[in-house]
Design a protein with these regions (language model features):
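Short metal-coordination and nucleic-acid-contact micro-motifs, chiefly zinc-binding Cys/His arrays
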Residues: 52
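Sec/Tat signal peptide C-region and signal peptidase I cleavage site
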Residues: 36-38
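Bacterial N-terminal signal peptides that target proteins for export
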Residues: 7-24
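Beta-propeller-forming repeat regions
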Residues: 40-47, 55-522
Length: 522
């Protein structure tokens, strides 16, 4: 203290000035480093985005980071994509479809990007994705209970609900439920009484009604697989079956029609597959048998309609494709079974397209498109604000623009019908991945058309009696109005949180399906 007290004021001031100078210098250096670091990070993210746009958009629509939350990108989506970039290997040893996958070349033999480039892509998505789950918007008011329908449970004795087909249109006066566990089509009367069953030896997922027979599609493997175990059978009214086409990759639909104008029956087959798949048509040959023709050589053919869209007298195809390259495609037939493709709608790879149908929603005389997108089952994933039911309005030249959207988490199928008989089309919708904790009634919704693109929300008291995978509409009791049939599949990917008590009830309550009897005529 004595030594310090003898210092001249000028010396003390000098020390202080030097300290301030050095502090300012260090702060300037730190600021410069911070600026340069921020610039480097910005450059790295820009580089990661450029790499993502180059490589991800080479296979499908570029997925913007905001489509998923950060955790889902890091723990699921990027890991799922790594084998397609050759930076990780998908283990195929011991898989029934392993050899087929290895031979297909669906995964590159070596890296498409370097390890460092892949990490740059990952850093870009991690930095730009939102931290919170996407789609957790404020809950909508609960749907009101409807008086339109009375629910009749349908029970397959001893069968845990694994319904893969619900049909009211296959056989007049009957409700059909196909069950993956029993491998049969179970037939119910309009009163809910079980009439009998036809054993098919597999899970039926689609039935097309013809004159005295049905073309029934058996998927082969309900869960994702590329084993060629699917088939189409001809089912007669006495329950006898004939094999039509076998060795298919998870077919989900088959439509008999004449595609080449030779007067013989051909088959359009939606080979949904998994990593592999194709949309094909099978030419009926003069002496019997079929010749296969590939139309689209990729997986994801989810739903097809046969229509003469261009008015030239032959059968064209409208096809909804899922599995990354999500599109609605018009395939125009030249009259001989050769097709030219026109993409009507295109979506990002996590859009989750599941089903569509073409109907005249606005009454202007041309066909609009009603679409449901809510497939949320590939991995645990947050609810998505862009999942729901949409109407795309046709301008008369098959140019489609979205006219209406109703958010529904996990929307799986939507049917536009005049359920209340007022002359316009309402929408019945099911969800396989709803928010069971906050909005369980969205398992089934009746969206009642109120005009001017406004729809009221209604549900049924038994909406959570099953996990609805499949649905159909038709007049099962012959009273002139449209009833609805729901099929419950209580298993499936654990992509959304399901309360344990609800999952147990699905397995044990004996509700394999629900017949919703329309009360309009009563």
């Amino acid at each position: 203290m004595m030594a310090f007290s003898r210092l001249k004021r000028s010396e003390v001031a000098g020390w202080l000035r030097e300290g301030v100078r050095r502090a300012a210098l260090w702060m300037a250096l730190a600021g410069l480093v911070s600026v340069r670091l921020a610039a480097w990070e910005a450059d790295e993210l820009e580089r990661g985005e450029a790499l993502a746009r180059q490589h991800c958009a080479a296979c499908h629509v570029f997925p913007e980071p905001g489509l998923l939350d950060r955790r889902t990108w890091e723990q699921h989506a990027l890991r799922k994509m790594a084998p397609y970039m050759g930076v990780a290997r998908l283990r195929t040893e011991g898989r029934p479809d392993g050899e087929r996958l290895e031979e297909s070349g669906v995964y590159p033999p070596g890296p498409v990007v370097t390890r460092e480039e892949w990490q740059a892509i990952g850093r870009y998505y991690s930095a730009r994705a939102p931290a919170r789950a996407v789609g957790l918007e404020a809950p909508r008011p609960p749907a009101a209970p409807t008086v339109q329908f009375v629910a009749r449970p349908l029970t397959i004795p001893g069968a845990v609900p694994r319904s893969t087909l619900a049909s009211l249109s296959a056989q007049g006066g009957e409700a059909w439920l196909a069950d993956a566990g029993t491998g049969a089509v179970h037939r119910f009367g309009a009163d809910g009484r079980l009439l009998g069953a036809w054993g098919l030896g597999g899970a039926a997922v689609h039935a097309w009604r013809g004159e005295g027979l049905w073309a029934v599609t058996l998927i082969g493997s309900v869960f994702p697989s590329d084993v060629l175990a699917g088939r189409v059978v001809r089912l007669r009214t006495d329950g006898a079956t004939d094999a039509w086409v076998e060795g298919l990759g998870r077919p989900v639909m088959s439509l008999p029609c004449d595609l080449n104008g030779d007067g013989r029956t051909d088959l359009v087959v939606n080979g949904f597959g998994n990593q592999l798949g194709r949309l094909s048509w099978h030419e009926g040959l003069p002496g019997g048998g079929w010749r296969a023709h590939e139309i689209l050589g990729r997986p994801g053919a989810a739903c097809t309609e046969t229509r003469d869209v261009d008015g030239d007298g032959d059968v064209d195809l409208l096809v909804l494709m899922a599995q990354a390259q999500e599109q609605l495609v018009l395939l125009e037939n030249d009259g001989h079974g050769d097709f030219s493709a026109r993409i009507l709608l295109q979506f990002h790879p996590v859009f989750g397209a599941v089903h569509f149908e073409s109907v005249d929603m606005d009454g202007d005389g041309d066909l609009d498109v009603v679409m449901s997108n809510g497939d949320n089952g590939e991995y645990p994933s947050p609810f998505k604000a862009y999942h729901g039911v949409r109407v795309f309005r046709n301008d008369g030249g098959m140019r489609l623009a979205e006219a209406w959207f109703h958010p529904v988490h996990g929307a799986f199928k939507a049917l536009a019908r005049d359920f209340d008989g007022d002359g316009d089309l309402d929408v019945a919708a099911i969800s396989f991945f709803p928010d069971y904790r906050r909005a369980p009634e969205e398992s089934f919704l009746l969206l009642r058309n109120e005009g001017a693109w406004r729809f009221g929300r209604e549900t049924i008291p038994g909406a959570t009696l099953g996990r609805w995978l499949t649905m159909d509409a038709g007049d099962v009791d012959g009273d002139g109005d449209l009833d609805v049939l729901l099929g419950s599949f209580c298993e499936g990917p654990p992509a959304v949180e399901i309360p344990p008590g609800l999952a147990t009830a699905w397995r044990t309550n004996g509700v394999n399906g629900l017949l919703l009897v329309n009360q309009r005529r009563r």
